[in-house]
Amino acid sequence: MEVHLKQERSEKPSFWGDLAISFPSLKGAPSTRYYFECEQILYRDFFPGLRGKLLLKTDLWNEAKNTEILGWAADQGAQPVGFDIALDLVRQAAAVFGNHRFTFLNSDVRHLPFAMNTFDLLYSMGTIEHFPEYKLAVAELFRVLKPNGTAIIGVPNKLDPFLRPLLVYALSLFRLYPYGMEKSFTPGELQRLLESVGFRVTTRTGILFMPGWLRMADLWCHCRVPWLTAITGPLVKIFAAL
């Protein structure tokens, strides 16, 4: 395991660092398994032939707390590089993947420590919406991706039929949403944002098609009352089958 721990100046590390320490693992929950299956489909569809490809992933939340998708990508032959703004998340991810040769860094997506045209593949799922400088972030992602590279960039869908953005807004009003600021985008808004920094958008798609309340309820049950996932699990499977 190769791990670089490099502090970056930012307003966010204390928030995400505190969350890394206080937040439980979501691994093993039925909705997390569904999330992992969705990510595998994305990789197979848009990152064919992973072997030998240098893959950059923004944030290490999923590696520390969730789907561990980088481990699966490494098993397919990719050469993963991941970074996170929170040093504690970097350390937790490093502990999970101690038997793999990854490069993990403590860094900020708005100021990446990589040269231009470095990566073959780029995966960013649920990162850029958590701060106002999302345009700076996608410009940095475009800068470090090779000209013939492929990126998967995902954000919350403002047109979610299950009204997740409204749920997040309501929870945030009462300080019940743990992930801080979270901006949602329509598909058109995201495409215009990406094209404004140079990306060429070829496909629009989505993952984790289920109500936000069900995902939250399933995770709460998994962490607090595990036997209740016998109820949430079948509900998750219904949406996974749609």
What are these regions (language model features)?
Residues 135-150:
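A short glycine-rich, Lys/Arg-flanked "PGG" loop and its adjoining helix->strand segment in the class I
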Residues 32-34, 172-189:
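Acceptor-substrate binding/catalytic loop of class I
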Residues 123:
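A conserved beta-strand element that flanks and buttresses the S-adenosyl-L-methionine
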Residues 54-111:
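Class I SAM-dependent methyltransferase SAM/SAH-binding core
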Residues 168, 203-242:
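A C-terminal cap/extension of S-adenosyl-L-methionine-dependent methyltransferases
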Residues 181-198, 204:
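Short alpha-helix
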Residues 1-51, 150-174, 215:
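Conserved class I S-adenosyl-L-methionine
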